């Protein structure tokens, strides 16, 4: 999973993040810059209290560790609707449903003339607004 610039403050929206790898192992990209995330109260980065509650804080974090959970969450929704899928089928669905629309935000480690060498696929969460059915084995739980 690679990171792309997205969100408030990003100067490279819809472009591969400069810190994200460009190698052939990257099959899909998701937003990974300026993601609001929870953080501990002892975090070395300055983080404001969440609505004045000092027991936990939030901050903007950038990295592929912010992009990966989005791809995993989308994969989990697919597996909920299709529990018989193999890992290869899931990967195929995720990459085929993505849009090939990214640009490389900077020079790659492989060549100064080569754009993203792996997949240039950006996940499109909006495509799944109502596509995955809700199911649960918890009694009394209903979709709103």
Predicted region positions:
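Catalytic-core segments of hydrolase enzymes
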Residues: 1-40, 93-100
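Hydrolase catalytic cores
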Residues: 32-111
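Residue-level signal for the start and early helices of compact helical domains
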Residues: 10, 19, 26, 52, ...
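Alpha/beta-hydrolase superfamily serine-hydrolase fold, recognizing
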Residues: 17-20, 43-45, 132-134
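Short, electropositive, low-hydrophobicity segments enriched in small/polar residues
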Residues: 6, 27, 67, 77, ...
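C-terminal subdomain of the subtilisin-like protease fold in secreted/lumenal serine endopeptidases
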Residues: 7, 15, 80-144
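Weak global preference for isoleucine
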Residues: 28, 35-36, 61, 116, ...
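Short glycine/serine/threonine-biased micro-segments
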Residues: 21, 61, 71, 116-117
């Amino acid at each position: 999973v690679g990171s792309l610039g997205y969100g408030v403050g990003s100067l490279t929206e819809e472009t591969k993040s400069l810190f994200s790898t460009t190698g052939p192992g990257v099959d899909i990209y998701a937003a990974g810059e300026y993601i609001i995330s929870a953080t501990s109260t002892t975090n070395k980065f300055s983080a404001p209290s969440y609505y004045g509650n000092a027991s936990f804080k939030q901050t903007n974090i950038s990295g592929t560790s912010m992009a990966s959970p989005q791809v995993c969450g989308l994969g989990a929704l697919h597996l909920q609707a299709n529990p018989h899928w193999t890992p290869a089928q899931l990967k195929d669905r995720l990459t085929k449903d993505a849009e090939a629309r990214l640009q490389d935000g900077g020079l790659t480690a492989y060549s100064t003339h080569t754009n993203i060498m792996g997949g240039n696929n950006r996940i499109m969460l909006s495509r799944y607004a109502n596509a995955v059915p809700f199911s649960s084995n918890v009694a009394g739980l209903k979709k709103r």
